[in-house]
Regions:
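Anion-binding alpha/beta catalytic cores of soluble intermediary-metabolism enzymes, centered on
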Residues: 1-12, 30, 35-37, 42-174
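Short catalytic helix/loop segments, enriched in acidic residues and glycine
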Residues: 22-32
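Short N-terminal binding/cap micro-motifs at the start of the first secondary-structure element
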Residues: 13-18
Length: 174
């Protein structure tokens, strides 16, 4: 198997983690006769520092041309004061939208061996918890309008969550 993996090292301590993940992938490749090639891509704070943009079009294209993306954590205190459209997290939203990654599955299960560590009541844990939450990632509140208005002499925050029929049907099929 030959695969090209886009590497986004991410921000703060994340590059150290991604570097070790690449070492693991290389060991897997050697053991199983695979070949992984890597393409460096920038996103988040490191892209802001290098290009002034959380995900330049050329970096998104590198990801689209790859077989997969290994992504480190995005954001950190250094970029917290930036305007909303220039924050590192906007790069992540654009990556998801650009690659059509609109959903993720969030499993919730309490294994018997870990039941005592659960913050939930024992009576609930003893009944068993095993379900999956499907989370929509690129519509609604992520790309809706966010604004503050004056109403009756006080500030009111408004966050719209627009979803098209297509987006709702698509997430419902997961």
């Amino acid at each position: 198997m030959n695969k090209n993996i886009a590497l986004i090292y991410g921000d703060c301590s994340s590059p150290e983690i991604v570097t070790q993940a690449v070492r693991v992938l290389d060991k897997i490749a050697a053991k199983h006769g695979h070949t992984f090639s890597y393409t460096r891509a920038y996103m988040g704070g490191e892209a802001i520092d290098k290009f002034g943009d959380p995900l330049p079009a050329a970096e998104l294209e590198k990801c689209k041309q790859s077989d997969s993306v290994l992504l480190g954590a995005i954001g950190g205190p250094k970029w917290e004061g930036m305007p909303g459209d220039r924050r590192p997290e906007k790069g992540l939203l654009r990556l998801r939208a650009g690659m059509g990654l609109y959903a993720n599955n969030r499993p919730a299960k309490i294994w018997p061996q870990l039941a005592d560590a659960s913050p939930l009541k024992k009576s609930i844990v003893d009944q068993g918890i095993d379900f999956i939450v499907v989370r929509e990632l690129i519509g609604g509140i992520y790309f809706g309008e966010h604004k503050t208005i004056e109403q009756n002499g006080e500030k009111v925050a408004i966050d719209t969550m627009p979803y098209s029929e297509h987006e709702i049907e698509r997430i419902g099929r997961i």
